[in-house]
Swiss-Prot record:
Lineage, broadest ranks: Viruses, Duplodnaviria, Heunggongvirae, Uroviricota, Caudoviricetes
Official protein name in the record: Depolymerase 1, capsule KN3-specific
Entry-linked Gene3D superfamilies: Single-stranded right-handed beta-helix, Pectin lyase-like
Function noted in UniProt: Functions as a receptor binding protein (RBP) and probably mediates the attachment to the host capsular exopolysaccharides. Displays a depolymerase activity that specifically degrades the KN3-type polysaccharides of Klebsiella pneumoniae capsule, which allows the phage to reach the host cell membrane and bind the entry receptor.
Primary residence: virion
Disulfide pairings: none
One annotated GO biological process: symbiont entry into host cell via disruption of host cell envelope
């Protein structure tokens, strides 16, 4: 559960200046207070504190009696920063401020709820070590009680205890002296007559080489006897007097207090570990109970020589850890275990110990070497819950840790390497999967798990085959493969790198590397995202190493309708990622829909006639950098509605001799597409655009970032709505349609005169008649309320 408080911060007193860590719309919405556990004082601006800067305040009063300084944002819900009235000019900044004020109010309401008494992850109310005041007395058995009730109850119990102390004062005095006597050794076990009574005994002498001072605990056949009721002990005679005579064969065991410890008896007793303490204050038995149970394959007969098949020993070690309710299986370092398949299955764990953790851990050089067998559902290492339907469908394998070992396959086998199916709370750390003909890593219905530093290499295609599996494959039923985090993972030397298929949601990839290699695929896309949503890639790297006639990265538009409820919803996000193509491609390199790229870099040789970037519907490209290395100048294709390209920088390594910077396809019907802000480095494109006629009447904007007239190197037009023209370069424009209020268009007649034709009534010049721009001349147009006017 997200417990972060964003709009309230407290600092310890001692300083005079304090930072404001949140944004605010007005200083009157910021409150500075002095706070202690039982007092609060709201300070006044200017007289009791002042602003040093927009994000820092300075106290002007003493803090005596208070231990904290609180800075809180409290945005007014009634005092609006922006008021709208009929006929006013609607500006984006006003809308942003109004929207931000609402967002601030909502954020502060959430923080207030969290600070009141939030729920923890288990749904329990969390007072966060604060008092709950004005609590009514409890009535029902499950009600909370207040301190008055507790004091009353303890007072009544105290009266009863005082009576007992008065009656048995001497006894308690003895106990106090006994407890303070450090020369005594307590908890020494003694068994009568070698564990078998003769029968009829009512008096038993404790025969020991040392003096026994008390017998605080006694059992007969495992049944505890109460001192003073079932038995008494006389230190003078060293005799136990029993209320009932023993029966022949009875097992009598007593724990005694002696003057010194017969260590051999203590260690040999059934409870010896409970009687030996440690520096931590815990007994040996308690430490053993709290420690995970350790198992090794060698305990079950594993050889670990890389030649002997250790499948049974490995499986027995895992099953032993599972059946004991959780434990650790330790793989020996610098050891190779040969195996057919290994199964970590939910049904092998007791239901009562469902929450116990299973750890399989290696050290340097721990290797599981697969024999190539494709039995056990064709998976080498399989972690799974119960496979079934109905109530069985919800029984997941949980809390498994795989750490510090390798799973090496046989490339001639089609087996999958590491498979997680119907599992949750799995953690993988530093696991290496290599040389499997099937998927190196496969996740089916996996959620709430962390995959850290997983490396998959040389997986996916059996030698000689042209169609294979993905190095990393993630899928699920509906939205079950969700809420997983992949950190610093690497998929390398795999022809098909990663596929995220239907049923995946809320999967996050951070600082991962996906590099193609080994074989050039001829049919499937190396990076394929289909029917998945709300995926995030951050600081990841994608590398293509082969000349290819197929698309490298594909995000399909076949998304579940339930998830895509609005036309501008973004479902796959790439942030600060890099895409590198070191070879020629003759197909679209990156072909996506419902995808957002933010601050990403694309380096492409673009050896073919297609476009490196092809954006389908609901796609966004912001602050991107594209490098084109060849003379083929194609850069970007926009083929879907509701898309945006903002602040795009294109670097040409050489002057393009063909292609266009941007192409609009999908006509007629393309609408709501905006290209706003672009720059070129080194060289200009061969042609700026193509195919941008017959839009559905919605705005399509092409505005060059920081446009400055660039003489003979400049193209015909930068910044336009839809247009059509005729003539050489062109000679006449007579149909400049649509646009938006305030849009400016710069027209440059590069090699021939250009006529602005007003016959259609769509362009109105200063003179009201046609205007001809001479060769290499420039004119500026502005859209005012849907009508184009000439500025110069």
């Amino acid at each position: 559960m997200d417990q972060d408080i964003k709009t309230v911060i407290q600092y310890p007193v001692g300083a005079t200046e304090f930072d404001i860590p949140f944004d605010y719309l007005s200083r009157k919405f910021v409150r500075v207070s002095l706070v202690s556990d039982d007092n609060r004082r709201l300070l006044s601006n200017i007289t009791e504190y002042r602003y040093v800067s927009k994000t820092r305040v300075k106290l002007l009063v003493e803090t005596t009696g208070f231990d904290r300084v609180e800075i809180r944002r409290f945005t007014s819900a009634s005092e609006r920063i922006v008021d709208f009235s009929d006929g006013s000019v609607l500006r984006a900044n006003d809308l942003n401020v109004s929207q931000l004020q609402s967002a601030h109010i909502a954020e502060e309401a959430r923080d207030s709820a969290l600070m009141a008494m939030p729920q923890d992850d288990a749904g329990n109310l969390d007072a966060r070590n604060r008092r709950i005041v004005r609590l009514a007395p409890g009535i029902d058995g499950t009600d909370a009680i207040n301190k008055d009730q507790l004091d009353t109850t303890l007072g009544e119990a105290g009266g009863i205890l005082s009576e007992i102390i008065e009656v048995k004062g001497d006894f308690y005095e003895y106990l106090e002296k006994f407890a303070e006597d450090t020369s005594m050794i307590r908890g020494v076990v003694w068994v009568y007559n070698a564990g078998s009574a003769v029968g009829g005994e009512t008096v038993v002498k404790v025969e020991k080489p040392t003096t026994v001072y008390s017998v605080p605990y006694l059992e007969i056949n495992g049944s505890r006897q109460e001192i003073g009721y079932h038995y008494d002990f006389d230190p003078a005679t060293q005799e136990l007097t029993l209320a009932k005579p023993l029966v022949a064969g009875d097992f009598l065991m007593a724990m005694t207090t002696e003057s010194y410890l017969p260590i051999e008896s203590l260690l040999a007793s059934p409870v010896g570990a409970e009687a030996i303490g440690t520096k931590s204050g815990k007994t040996i038995q308690r430490i053993l109970d709290e420690s995970p149970r350790y198992f090794t394959p060698e305990m079950f007969g594993a050889k670990g020589d890389g030649l002997t098949n250790d499948t049974k020993a490995l499986q027995d070690a895992v099953d032993a850890a599972m059946s004991s309710g959780g434990g650790k299986v330790i793989l020996k370092g610098n050891t190779t275990y040969l195996f057919d398949h290994l199964l970590v299955a939910r049904e092998k764990s007791p239901q009562s110990r469902f929450e116990a953790r299973l750890i399989i851990e290696g050290s340097g050089g721990s290797v599981l070497k697969h024999t190539g067998s494709i039995t056990e559902a064709a998976h080498a290492f399989w972690v799974r819950g119960v496979l079934g339907t109905g109530s069985l469908a919800d029984i997941y394998m949980r809390d498994v840790v795989l750490r510090d070992f390798s799973i090496n396959g046989t490339v001639t086998s089609t087996a999958n390497g590491l498979v997680l199916q119907r599992a949750t709370a799995v953690r993988i750390e530093n696991v290496y999967v290599n040389d499997f003909g099937g998927n190196g890593y496969r996740a089916l219905d996996l959620y709430d798990s962390t995959i850290d530093s997983l490396e998959v290499q040389r997986c996916g295609i059996v030698p000689g085959a042209t169609v294979g599996s993905y190095g990393m494959y993630i899928t699920g039923a509906y939205d079950q493969s969700n809420a997983n985090h992949y950190i610093a993972c690497r998929v390398e030397m795999c022809p098909l790198i990663i596929a995220i298929d239907k049923g995946c949601r809320h999967n996050y990839f951070h600082n991962c590397k996906f590099e193609q290699g080994r074989v050039n695929p001829t049919t499937s896309n190396p990076v394929y995202i289909n029917d998945a949503t709300e995926l995030a890639f951050e600081a990841c790297q994608f590398v293509q190493n082969y000349d290819s006639a197929i698309r490298f990265l594909v995000v399909t538009d076949a998304l579940f309708p339930y998830w895509v409820t609005h036309g501008t919803e973004k479902v796959v996000n790439f942030t600060d990622c890099s895409f590198v193509c070191s070879r020629s491609v003759t197909a679209y390199w990156i072909d996506v829909a419902y995808t957002t790229f933010t601050a990403c870099a694309f380096s492409s040789c673009n050896g073919g006639t297609q476009f490196p970037l092809s954006l389908g519907k609901n796609s966004f490209l912001t602050d991107a950098k594209v490098v084109i290395r060849t003379a083929e100048g194609n850069v970007l294709e926009l083929k879907g509605s509701h898309s945006r390209v903002t602040n795009l920088k294109v670097t040409y390594f050489q002057q393009p001799t063909s292609g266009v910077f941007i192409k609009f396809t999908g006509l007629p019907g393309l609408s709501d597409v905006v290209v706003d802000g672009f720059t070129f480095e080194n060289f200009e494109p061969f042609a700026p655009y193509s195919g941008h006629t017959d839009f559905m009447g919605d705005v399509v904007v092409m505005r060059r970032a920081g446009y400055v007239y660039n003489g003979t190197n400049d193209r015909v037009i930068y910044g336009c709505s839809t247009l059509s023209y005729s003539g050489a370069s062109p000679a006449t424009w007579n149909n400049l349609r649509n646009g938006y209020n305030g849009q400016v268009v710069i027209v440059h007649a590069k090699s021939n005169p250009v006529t602005l034709d007003v016959s259609g009534g769509l362009i109105i010049t200063k003179t009201g008649s046609n205007v001809t721009i001479p060769t290499n001349g420039v004119s500026a147009l502005v859209n005012i309320s849907g009508v184009w006017r000439q500025l110069y």
